């Protein structure tokens, strides 16, 4: 009796685990990081002393270009704001210095310092995954280990997005055109960045980085002390457009080769750019996509609008619970029996952490709203 070849029992070869997208954290590097002790409170209060002759509400020094009442700086209002600022300076020079003159034998009136507080309340975040004994006992992959990695990456993403939600809502706003998000119809320009630099400098914002000197290597360039700029990866192509950004220097041409982050992409004038796919745009939030077809859209009626975050030192901060700066990982392996799972058929992997963030000084950072060119 002839025998046929037996069919394969499995007929599949176990390949390697494929790489996957890993969330990127970039915003943390520019923030003031504070660890709160346990068993104290869920609230942190940051305090600054308002400088002499400064606005007690905003902390802006007199003579500095003021913000508009709704928190948005309209580019069209620039001349009027500068004129107002110049008038304030004239008044300060005439009265401020004179007010500090002393009269012989007369005790001057004592001034008082004014505090400005920024309150941050910790929030608790977490995630939980489950798996079964069948997956653990019979599956060819280490499901528990894979879930641990997934949890760590998810927590990192949550932490980045929580911070991003705060900084992109900063009130010192610039628009590449128009005066609102839904009017955006063009890409980022060097002139808008220069306006931001001027505003930050007038508000005494300190730059985040020092000057980098060129090296002996061919083609390297010096890099100025700079504000940090965080943007979506879709913006990179516009930055490399030499027509709009003459003098843009990619990281490969840094003389001393000291990128601030693995996602740093380049610099121009007093800005260094760090790009991340997590810094998502307002999808379809801009002008009509059918009219402005040269710009990225998510398939809706409007073009995508990208917040570009520009920051000096101590503009925003993050708070974590001390001892839980990363996260508290929890693992319940399969086989753990209790009244809710008497046969120990389920396992769990999860994590929780406490964190929050806040803008500490609105005048030391800015958000530019822009479109991104299609390729």
Language-model features: where?
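Extracytoplasmic
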Residues: 41, 124, 224, 344-346
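Short acidic, glycine/tyrosine-flanked loop/strand segments centered on an H-E-D-like triad
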Residues: 110-139, 318-324, 330
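Surface-exposed intrinsically disordered loops and tails
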Residues: 61, 65-103, 107, 173-186, ...
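Structured, hydrophobic secondary-structure cores that serve as assembly/anchoring elements
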Residues: 123-125, 129-139, 143, 211-241
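N-terminal "assembly arms/tails" that initiate or stabilize quaternary assembly
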Residues: 1-120, 365, 370
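Sequence/fold signature of self-assembling virion shell proteins
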Residues: 2-30, 183-208, 226, 234-375
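Alpha-helical scaffold segments that mediate packing/assembly in large oligomeric complexes
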Residues: 138-213
């Amino acid at each position: 009796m002839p025998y046929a070849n037996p069919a394969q029992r499995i007929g599949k070869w176990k390949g390697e685990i494929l790489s996957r997208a890993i969330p990127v954290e970039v915003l943390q590097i520019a923030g003031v990081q504070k660890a709160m002790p346990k068993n104290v409170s869920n609230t942190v209060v940051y305090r600054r002393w308002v400088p002499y002759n400064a606005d007690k509400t905003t902390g802006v020094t007199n003579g500095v270009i003021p913000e508009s009442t709704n928190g948005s700086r309209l580019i069209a209002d620039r001349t009027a704001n500068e004129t107002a600022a110049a008038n304030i300076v004239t008044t300060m020079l005439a009265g401020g210095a004179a007010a500090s003159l002393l009269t012989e034998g007369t005790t001057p009136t004592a001034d008082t310092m004014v505090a400005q507080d920024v309150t941050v309340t910790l929030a608790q975040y977490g995630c939980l995954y489950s798996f079964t004994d069948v997956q653990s006992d019979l599956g060819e992959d280490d499901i528990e280990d894979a879930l641990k990695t997934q949890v760590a990456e998810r927590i990192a993403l949550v932490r980045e997005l929580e911070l991003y939600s705060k900084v992109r809502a900063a009130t010192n706003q610039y628009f590449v055109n128009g005066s609102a998000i839904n009017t955006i119809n063009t890409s980022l320009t060097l002139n808008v960045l220069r306006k931001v630099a001027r505003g930050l400098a007038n508000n005494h914002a300190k730059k985040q980085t020092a000057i980098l000197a060129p090296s002996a290597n061919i083609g390297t360039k010096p890099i100025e002390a700079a504000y940090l700029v965080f943007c979506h990866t879709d913006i990179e192509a516009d930055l490399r457009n030499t027509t709009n950004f003459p003098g843009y220097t990619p990281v490969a041409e840094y003389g001393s080769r000291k990128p601030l982050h693995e996602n740093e992409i380049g610099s121009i004038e007093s800005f260094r750019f760090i790009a991340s796919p997590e810094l998502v745009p307002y999808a379809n939030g801009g002008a009509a996509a059918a009219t402005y077809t040269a710009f990225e859209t998510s398939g809706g009626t409007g073009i995508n609008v990208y917040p570009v975050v520009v920051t000096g030192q101590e503009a925003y901060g993050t708070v974590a619970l001390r001892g839980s700066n990363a996260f508290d990982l929890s693992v319940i392996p399969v086989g753990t029996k209790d009244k809710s799972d008497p046969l120990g058929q389920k396992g769990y992997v999860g994590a929780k952490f406490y964190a929050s963030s806040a803008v500490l000084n609105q005048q030391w950072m800015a958000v530019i709203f822009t479109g991104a060119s299609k390729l």
